[in-house]
C-alpha cells in the first residue's frame, strides 16, 4: 500500500471539495513550478465536471490560489481573486465544456510569464486531493509525485540527456525512472526524472546551466502516494493482507496502520503528532460550527447541525438515540463548515468529511474514550480508506457518492468496531456491510455545490456506519468479503451515468424546486 494515513485523513483544507477545491489548487500549485516566474497572465480552461460545477465548488478561487502559491489549508483561498489583483496577476476562467477523452476533473492552465514564452499545463484531480499532471505544452507526461521529481525543459539535442543524468548521478541520486517527451525531432522536449533520494536545492541551478536546457524545477506534488523504501515491512494492498499482518503481529488494524505510518516517515513521534493535529481539528470543526454557525456559499446550509443537536431532548429517545443523534449533528456541522470555505479534514473527501469525525467523536463521548483510543480508531479508518482509494475510488466524479460517503461510512464503521473492542474480522465485516448498504449512491449536488444533498447524506452515512458496526459486533458476518465489496464498488461506479457523477446534471440536482433558485445552469 502506497498511501499515507494522512492522504486519507487529509488534506487539511479549505472547503468545500477535496477534488474540486484542494485538488484544483494543487494542480495549479504544481503548474507554477513548471513555468518561469513571475507570471503576468494565467488562463484556466475547465473541462467536464470542473466546467459544470466550478462556481459551487470554489474551483475557480482554488486555481488562482494555487498559482499564487497558497496551500490547501490557507484561509486566504476564499480571497484569492483579490490577492491576484493585488499581485498584478491577470487571469481568466473559461468553461471548456465536455470532452470524453479527458478525465472528469481536468483543467488546462496557460501561463504567460512576464518574460519568455507561454507554458501550457494540463492536470487532473483524482479525488481526495490527489492529482496528476498529464500534459505540458501538448506533450503527454505523467507526473504524480510518487517519488522526488525533477522536471527539465530542453531542446531535443544530442548529449543533453547524458549531461542531465550525469549531473544527477554526480550528486548520488539513483534515478528510478526517466521519461523524455518531445513534440518533434530537434524541437522542444521535456524530461521527467524520478529519484529515490530527495533533490538537493542547488541541483536545480546546476541543471539550468546545462547547454540546451531552457528551464528546470524540482516538483513536489502534495498529496501524492509516496512509494515506500525497501525497509517498509507493514505494507498491504488488500483487506486480506491487512488481516494477515494484524494476525502475525497480534494487533488491531489501527495499531498496524500507526506502525506502518511510523515506518513510512521514520519517526513514531511525528506520526502521532500528525494524528493529534487531525483529531484536534476534528473536535474544532464540530464544536465551533455548533456554537457559531455561519451560512454556506450557496445558502442551503445555515445552522441545521445546531438545530438537530437542540432537538435531541425531544426526539432522540424514540428515534435515533442520544449517541447517534450527536453523531449526525457532528457530521452535519463539518459539512456546514466546509460549505462556508472553513478549514476541515477531508476524510477521505471534503464532501464526506463529516461521517468519520461524527461517528468516532460521538461514540467516544458515549464510552468516555481517551485521545489514545480515538486516535487508534482514526488510524483504523485511515487503513480502510486507503484500501478503497487504491482499489476503487473516492472521487464522486469517478464513482458517485458511494465513492465518497460510502467510503467514509465504511471507514467509520470499522473505526467504531475497533473503538468498541471488536476484532479485525469484525472491522472488515462492518466495512463490507456498509459498502453494500450504500452501493450505487449517486452524486447529484444541487446547483453544483457541496451542500444539498451532501449534508443529509453525511447524516445517512453516519447512520449506516452505526448500524453496520452493531451488526458486525453482534457477529452478523457479511457473505461478501471486504475486498470483493470494494471490487463491486469500483464496478458499480464505472456503470453510473455521467449525469450521476458530480456533474449536477441528474438526480436531485435537476428537480424543478432546485433549479428555480439557480439563476442559470452551473
Predicted feature residues:
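Acidic-glycine-rich active-site phosphate/pyrophosphate-binding loop
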Residues: 1-5, 36-40, 321-338, 372-393, ...
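Conserved phosphate/anionic-ligand binding catalytic regions in large, soluble enzymes, centered on
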Residues: 10-30, 341-359, 403-408
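Alpha-helical support elements that line or immediately flank enzyme active sites
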Residues: 21-35, 158-160, 357-368, 413-421
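A structural-propensity feature for long, helix-poor, extended segments
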Residues: 43-86, 380-415, 430, 437-464, ...
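A conserved regulatory-domain signal marking ACT and ACT-like small-molecule sensing domains
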Residues: 75, 91-93, 120-229
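Functionally critical mobile loop/hinge segments
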Residues: 79-86, 90-93, 418-522
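C-terminal regulatory domains involved in ligand/effector binding and gene-expression control
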Residues: 126, 222-225, 229-313, 519
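Active-site cofactor/substrate anionic-group-binding motifs, chiefly glycine-
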Residues: 307-348
